[in-house]
Amino acid sequence: MAARQIAFIELYVSEPKIAVDYLGDALGFTRVAESADDESRSILLRQGRLQMVVTAGAEAARFLDAHGDGVADIAFGCDDVTAARARAVGAGAVDLGTVRGSPVVGSFGPVRHTLVPASAEVLLPGGRTWTPLVDDSAPEQRIRLLDHVAICLEAGTLEQYADFYTDAFGLDRYSSEFIDVGGSSMDSIVVRSSSDDITFTLVAPGSATGSGQLNAFLHRNGGPGVQHLALLVDDIVAAVSEATDRGVAFLQTPGTYYEALADRFPDRSAMIESLRATNVLADRDEWGYLLQLFTRSPYPRNTLFYELIQRRGARGFGSANIRALYEAVERDRLIAG
């Protein structure tokens, strides 16, 4: 009955060509197929095991008016979709009926979970008529899979949603963190499936009245939503360099960060210089180390953004990187005004 994998992510967008070009030409996704009906037009993109559906049209209009471009659906692969729906609804999820042949339940804000049969293969999202596309323009693919989804929630609701994902979909609590930086703060809980294929980082501002980045996100987004999608790569320095050349804007990291990093990684001087050149952040956990960098949001409301992440043994999220990434977003927000 538990959710086992993420089958696809669906974005609702106002400018589909711009959104598809960003994912395809800049981030390296391949345009696989398209589908259209009276209510919408969708493009399916794929890279590694990650499928992204970009949808525009009347189906998306209400979502876009309220929230702007963003993630509308995180589809779960389940061993038994009927039992999964019953469990989720029993734990408090809103039953949204059957859409395109699959049960759908509500979650946080406007985001839904379509429930589909789990599969060892990457399958086309069901219930639509897909027409294959030939995409000769996709650059070298660096992304292997979706590492985690960061979800921004309202202050005071973090425990509620951590319990919800535990009870409704069988995810387990993995870790928690609290960050306080210059008067703004972030509370977080990580929940993860037993398969390790679903990881949600639930984040919320420490106070509903603060002026930090999470409250700013909630205001621009019209409530809770997906803050970022983290994309796992094998070589983040190459991935960032190539994506930058193709027009992806990444957050900047101050030089002083790398001076301190040299003390924490005394045997990695060559690596640190490569990280400095690409603004990539580094941290350790008890299993290894991880490298991360955030993009700027490519969407009109400056809400959803992306992360590139490389894991060299690390399974969790280093405390130093959580703080450094939070500070990077906060700096960028203050500079942008």
Indicate where each model-derived feature is located.
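N-terminal beta-strand motif that seeds the catalytic metal site of vicinal oxygen chelate
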Residues: 1-17, 71-76, 123-162, 224-231, ...
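Hydrophobic, ordered structural segments
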Residues: 67-140, 150-152, 298-300, 305, ...
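ER-lumen resident redox/N-glycosylation machinery signature
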Residues: 30, 58-65, 116-119, 140, ...
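Vicinal oxygen chelate
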Residues: 4-14, 62-85, 103-106, 144-155, ...
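Active-site-adjacent "gating/activation" loops or surface patches in catalytic cores
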Residues: 130, 195-212
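C-terminal functional regions that serve as terminal interaction/effector modules
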Residues: 13, 228-238, 242-251, 257-337
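Short loop/beta submotifs within extracellular cysteine-rich repeat domains
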Residues: 52-53, 199-200, 210, 301, ...
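Core segments of cupin and vicinal oxygen chelate
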Residues: 1-52, 90, 96, 101-107, ...
